[in-house]
Swiss-Prot record:
The gene is rplN. Part of the 50S ribosomal subunit. Forms a cluster with proteins L3 and L19. In the 70S ribosome, L14 and L19 interact and together make contacts with the 16S rRNA in bridges B5 and B8. Keywords: Ribonucleoprotein, Ribosomal protein, RNA-binding, rRNA-binding. InterPro entries: Ribosomal_uL14 (IPR000218), Ribosomal_uL14_bac-type (IPR005745), Ribosomal_uL14_CS (IPR019972), Ribosomal_uL14_sf (IPR036853). It holds the Pfam family Ribosomal_L14. The keyword Transmembrane does not apply. GO terms for cellular component: cytosolic large ribosomal subunit. It comes from Corynebacterium aurimucosum (strain ATCC 700975 / DSM 44827 / CIP 107346 / CN-1). This is Large ribosomal subunit protein uL14. The keyword Translocase does not apply. HAMAP family: Ribosomal_uL14. Binds to 23S rRNA. Forms part of two intersubunit bridges in the 70S ribosome. SUPFAM superfamilies: Ribosomal protein L14 (SSF50193). GO terms for biological process: translation.
Length: 122
């Protein structure tokens, strides 16, 4: 369950390491985000020479969440960390590599580029 002030690990090579969620997109009273949801965040930690700098405001999609997500077959999927991938304006990833596994739910939400770049889809 990702909400305002949640900290996320960045799962791509855009140059950011950690994000702080400012807003969950998808309605004026939406409080929580899950896998495949888009959030607005600020970069709290970044590596030198990266595409993004500390303090930048970015959009990101959640690719891993500690809170379990129920699937249509009745099974649940949960990860060890909360992680996101930073997006460009057209909902394409800003980085060129994705680190770690991503959830299959991203395919249903039309993030095909992220799914194709990921080393493992669970």
């Amino acid at each position: 369950m990702i909400q305002q002030e949640s900290r996320l690990r960045v799962a791509d090579n855009s140059g950011a390491r950690e994000l702080l969620v400012i807003r969950v997109l998808g309605g004026s009273v939406r409080r929580f985000a899950g896998i495949g949801d888009i959030v607005v965040a600020t970069v709290k930690e970044a590596i030198p020479g990266g595409n993004v700098k500390e303090g930048d405001i970015v959009k990101a999609v959640i690719v891993r969440a500690k809170k379990e997500t129920r699937r249509p077959d009745g099974s649940y999927i949960a990860f060890d960390e909360n992680a996101a991938v930073i997006l460009k304006g057209d909902n394409e990833p800003r980085g060129t590599r994705i680190f770690g596994p991503v959830a299959r739910e991203l395919r249903d939400k039309r993030f095909m580029k992220i799914v194709s770049l990921a080393p493992e889809v669970i």
